[in-house]
Design a protein with these regions (language model features):
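Flavin (FAD/FMN)-binding glycine-rich loop and adjacent Rossmann-like elements that form
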Residues: 2-7, 11-195
Length: 195
């Protein structure tokens, strides 16, 4: 009603309807799609200091955490070459300074070597989750308040950023024995969705 969401209607595959009335509604969708679909007023990002009156709050309330499309690499052992195909629009400079072993023409490299960078995401079975924020596979963008076609283009950009980082690890960092593990039932072998 107006600028307040007082519940929701759900329709299942049998065309049965369930109506839920609520005093308080929390949008639990990944990207706030329920409130947007309802036409309700909502905020995204961190609270602006002008709103919260907190001195330590940021001034830009549209700051949204970067999205990451995680991947799992497996160490296939010395001599293995698991190098993936060069991703479309690959740009190695996006990954410069990700660690001390990487080229770093401007600024300072993140203060770990390539092995420690992979160790950050180590999981059992000689596998490594690739989720590296420092010049790695974090993807900056607003995936909220955009139409489905533009959102899918942006999400494809995030997938390509992760594939590019994997390619960089394998080629520029010389770690070609680390290949995509067969962990996810997806064509690209990346996680089913970003976080």
């Amino acid at each position: 009603t107006g600028n307040k969401v007082t519940g929701a209607s759900f329709i299942n595959t049998k065309k049965e309807t369930l109506i839920v009335h609520a005093a308080l509604t929390i949008d639990g969708t990944d990207l706030g799609d329920a409130f947007a679909a309802a036409g309700a007023k909502y905020d995204i990002g961190m609270e602006d200091s002008s709103y919260s009156k907190e001195a330590m709050a940021p001034g830009n309330y549209l700051i949204i955490q970067d999205l990451t499309w995680a991947a799992i690499l497996k160490d296939f052992g010395k001599g293995a070459d698991k190098t993936i195909a060069r991703p479309a629009n690959y740009d190695s400079t996006l990954y410069f300074c990700c660690c001390t072993d990487a080229p770093c023409k401007e600024g300072k490299p993140y203060n770990v070597n390539a092995a420690k960078m992979l160790e950050y995401g180590r999981i059992p079975g000689d596998k490594f989750m690739i989720n590296w924020p420092a010049h790695g596979n974090d993807f900056i963008g607003n995936f909220i308040d955009i139409n489905p076609i533009d959102r899918e283009k942006a999400l494809e950009g995030a997938r390509q950023k992760t594939l590019g980082f994997i390619y960089f690890i394998q080629t520029t960092l010389g770690m070609k024995q680390y290949g995509l593990a067969n962990e996810f039932p997806s064509n690209h072998k990346l996680a089913l969705m970003p976080y």
